[in-house]
Amino acid sequence: MWQNNYKAYGAPRLRLALADLNLHHGINRIRRLMRSAGIYSVMSRRFNKPTTTVDYSQRPNLIKHLPAANAWSMDITYLKLNNGQWVYLASVLELRTYQILSHQISTTMDTRLVLITLQRALSTHQKPSYLHTDMGSQFTSFGFENLLNHHKIDHSYSKLGHPYDNARIESFHSLLKREMIYQFRFPSIAHLILDVAKYIHWFNNERISIANRKMKVA
């Protein structure tokens, strides 16, 4: 069970997963068994990544005081292949449900990457009232702003230098790296594309969310 879920589950989620199989154990017992078996939830590690600069004035955060707003969040993160090559993952997340609506991987971090990713989400889901992003050049480009205007979606922006304004999708990308990327090797972008798609399907449909289960875990 631990192995089949990307080694991502610590004692609280393992307790919930076992309960789904009608196997009920106290969390302290599960922790003891995990220690004796050398099982632990995977931990994150850091790597140095390329940096980008922004030459734009601050634009408004429209959803800061609207936590229940009908909004999507979008971001780009860096991933690395075995040969050291950087590739780029763009993702669209629905803030209400914490579901990934679309994603795209590319060898170039350009406007085309974010346009394709957003267009995929719009083709399969009802458009949001707001889209929240950082102020990277891809998201402030004429083409991207024009697409939002065409669909009458208001663009909300994180404050410059404050990535946690986009915390939910930052959190998803962090989980992706900790629970999957750092555990495997990717000899090609094709391997990475396949494994990221599998992880996102698991994340959307199978990964246990303690907050949503309303079950006492301590």
Label each region the model flagged:
Residues 4-7, 20-23, 65-66, 81-83, ...:
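Conserved, non-catalytic sequence blocks in retroelement Pol enzymes and Pol-derived host proteins
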Residues 85, 103-125:
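Active-site beta-loop-alpha junctions of metal-dependent nucleic acid enzymes
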Residues 68-101, 107-108:
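An active-site-proximal beta-strand-loop segment
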Residues 149-153, 175-218:
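C-terminal domain-tail junction helix/linker
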Residues 14, 30, 34, 63, ...:
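Mobile genetic element proteins and their domesticated derivatives, centered on retroelements
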Residues 43-48, 131-135, 150-168, 184-187:
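RNase H-like polynucleotidyl transferase catalytic core
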Residues 118, 126-141, 213-216:
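Acidic/histidine-rich, metal-coordinating catalytic segments
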Residues 1-69, 162, 217:
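Basic, flexible linker segments flanking DNA-binding modules
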